[in-house]
């Protein structure tokens, strides 16, 4: 069991993550006190450190299914670990040093579990590069990494892992909330008002494509000159093609019951190619295409809420890179009608660095032997300790 006395002492932790958009390493330096209902997190510093261009290209190629030798895989693993270690060191400049690092690593492959007959299940699989033992060695700081595998080993999806953190940082005594992450892939945490049984009612899952699909489209439409649509301005100048959105929403993933998870394996380059092929008869302009892909993200989120949530939330809080896409935010607000759409900044948690903050908290919990997963979100049969500890 964890020590309540230890949890009262501020724990200075670095949280690190690079998401499915592969746009860089988000690093957050935080001070944590408490554990669950008394959890308090102060963000001291947050910054995104871009990958070197050649490393990003190699990661994206592997995520798209390109074959790679074991030697190349080892080199990539080392290069990512080095980049994460450097980010951890740089974020601490000017501050007292951290005593713990929580590193998610870089996901390059994710396979959800699959039912294999009555009472049987083929376990999922996940691979995050950027090994924690190397980060611990290079920084001299104890590092927790490989967070997803313990949940997967007992039959869960290993995702989403952030809902338990969201529950203790962003819940409200009288209001139900959805925390909607708009990273490469969209995912939600539904958090009911804090009643007697509120923790058991929390749920979460991946809603579908978000930034990664939009970014891939921008790169394709600009022949690589741009990597994203700033503020969604380009998409905002176009008009969505609703018949295409309706067609794309027939994809089986959107109709799978939660818990569920996905990634670039399903919504990556091959899927985008199919989207462009589907759009050919409509002769859409580049702006129209981006507006239509944005509308798919919005429609998949709203469909998820209306189909699978026990009730619509009273408020939605956005986080992740897509929370800065003003056009996407406006379209989501329009679709959700009277449900206010805000960012987690307005609830006191940085929308840009919430995921990095979450992995700092998960590392803090692992150090105190507190489970980090929520079975109602990941589909695991029970709670488990998340992450492997590497002494610094």
UniProtKB/Swiss-Prot annotation:
Keywords, sorted A to Z: ATP-binding, Carbohydrate metabolism, Kinase, Nucleotide-binding, Transferase
Top-level EC class: transferase
EC number in record: 2.7.1.170
Catalytic activity: 1,6-anhydro-N-acetyl-beta-muramate + ATP + H2O = N-acetyl-D-muramate 6-phosphate + ADP + H(+)
InterPro entries listed in its UniProt record: Anhydro_N_Ac-Mur_kinase (IPR005338), ATPase_NBD (IPR043129)
Keyword 4Fe-4S attached: no
Domain of life: Bacteria
Entry annotated with the keyword Nucleotide-binding: yes
Example of a GO biological process term: peptidoglycan turnover
A Pfam family that the UniProt record links to this protein: AnmK
PANTHER family, per the entry: ANHYDRO-N-ACETYLMURAMIC ACID KINASE (PTHR30605:SF0)
Family: Belongs to the anhydro-N-acetylmuramic acid kinase family.
Function statement: Catalyzes the specific phosphorylation of 1,6-anhydro-N-acetylmuramic acid (anhMurNAc) with the simultaneous cleavage of the 1,6-anhydro ring, generating MurNAc-6-P. Is required for the utilization of anhMurNAc either imported from the medium or derived from its own cell wall murein, and thus plays a role in cell wall recycling.
UniProt name for this protein: Anhydro-N-acetylmuramic acid kinase
Organism for this UniProt entry: Nostoc sp. (strain PCC 7120 / SAG 25.82 / UTEX 2576)
High-level lineage: Bacteria, Bacillati, Cyanobacteriota, Cyanophyceae, Nostocales
